[in-house]
């Protein structure tokens, strides 16, 4: 058989396999096939990026940079996601979003996304999904949408089908660098009707030499100068296990369990200088500062799925999810000689804060196929959520004796019971695809103070949350879509906690128990185009919110800077996101992720307003060098970001990676280097209050270099293979996906 016929046969086989997979509901989420045909291997690889009108999927395992990067590094590449210089994450232009892991909400990840993703190696993740219009099936919380992290499960051949092949795959990975060291392991496999997956990791990060300096000038001429250099240590560990068993041809049961621990030790010795105004000739003081944080999270779930027809288009899923997330924070402040200090009271202190969030979730989802082109989803959900906070304040004597200060201590409990029901209809009519849904959530909330000042209260409220989307396939490889959603944000325990943190003698911070649920509206228009060498996705969005929760600061009568939260902001946001994936040459790929937005923020209650443009640009060039060396070079550039009381300056840094597979592609070696434009990443912030102006400079030692080794093992063939210097199959599969018009297949 000549070469031309071999290529033709390979293409036909790939198309047949993809067509077959689209008409069959599999337990695995993969439609990739790898088979041998008389020494000819046919490989169809998933696209690096799959764009839909209401969801974007970034295939992390297909990106060569994942071998040497963290999940946070990969998020900088993901469309609709922005990561700033302080590792703060926004999704769809909002810092309020929910993090799911393998399709299930994870409170630990949602509470600490930056810290966790910065410690988590990217090779533990299969896909990152950005669901900008989650629809009625998902919880209404999270104004930016849902960030779903799909963990890597190297599925063996036959998993989820009738072929009950036994086997396993796995890998062990280790990273050593100037700032972090980590080790991780993954194993997954199948024994008869049982499939299993387990992973674990440990990361230790050390960052020394971070500096914070600011000057605060008040209307009366009082001036405060502050300088702090700190060292930070962050240990992080995580383990997950999942099991699935096929009870019969129409039903299966699965269970998952995960444990995550996160710690942070922060040490510094700030120096504070006061002068002018009420401070006269002035004075200065220094103090030793220590902060210890420990966070542990456990989550477990069990799911039962039952199909009601052999086509598996009608099915019921019953689910239970449990999660708990306790956090302990200890703050120590010990002052130097304070004999010359006047005007403010200084004394050694210790504060201990314990919080715990616990959730029980029960859910039932039913999917019914009305016809070959229409589908109806409906279901119900109940969440029992309890948040406890115990904050204690201790005065420390000269001999280090600790005495509880009950007047400044507080203990309270916040409970939420949420009952939800939804219905969602999806249809596909030729080139048109549509989805309409509605969700209603009723919340019963109660706050009870066990100790400290505060009034117990009960309240209940309901939220009707509509969603809709419409898509049209203009031509093969080209579509356009529009979607609308209403999202809500319930204030968490951090915002509600009315405990007053007095660890800083010149400032206090506290939460607000009177916060209301935030309601945000978002309208997006999406355009997708791609051919065998070029992909373009553009999203135009407009969002508005009239009761956004903002953190704001003001000076009180005692000249203390108060920082708290309130539903005080009205926001309007117009945005454009552009993603380009261009196969310039056979071995050269260029990627661009550009986000541009205009924000208008106003607060009638505070009398403040601010507005301005900001942009974030990621440009990435991937090149295959001789000897199959994979080389990447890229840059992240962000402009000034505006908030209600000021702005944060832009930033820029560069990175490069070099990867090589050896030992019959069982061992991957990857080298990564990242550096800002200066020796440290410089971040400047300006805050303007009614009676003060503050300018802050933060310098972060961001420069990193690391080496990663990954050993792959197993007794089955890998189902997923990296496409070498060719993304033709990526776009072929994506072109088939776009013709579904948004209808799941």
Task: Give a label for each model feature.
Residues 410-416, 459, 488-537, 544, ...:
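Outer-membrane beta-barrel signature, preferentially recognizing the C-terminal barrel domain
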Residues 227, 359-361, 405-410, 510-512, ...:
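Outer membrane beta-barrel strand-and-loop segments of large Gram-negative receptors
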Residues 71-74, 114-115, 130, 142-172:
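N-terminal periplasmic accessory domains that precede
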Residues 71, 77, 105-132:
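Short acidic/polar hinge/loop motifs at secondary-structure boundaries
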Residues 23-64, 84-86, 92-96, 131-133:
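Short, acidic, small-residue-rich periplasmic hinge/interaction motif at the N-terminus
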Residues 240-246, 250-262, 289-448, 473, ...:
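Face-selective signature of the C-terminal outer-membrane beta-barrel domain
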Residues 150-169, 207-215, 225-226, 236-241, 444-446, 476-521, 542-562, 676-690, ...:
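Surface-exposed extracellular loop regions of Gram-negative outer-membrane beta-barrel proteins
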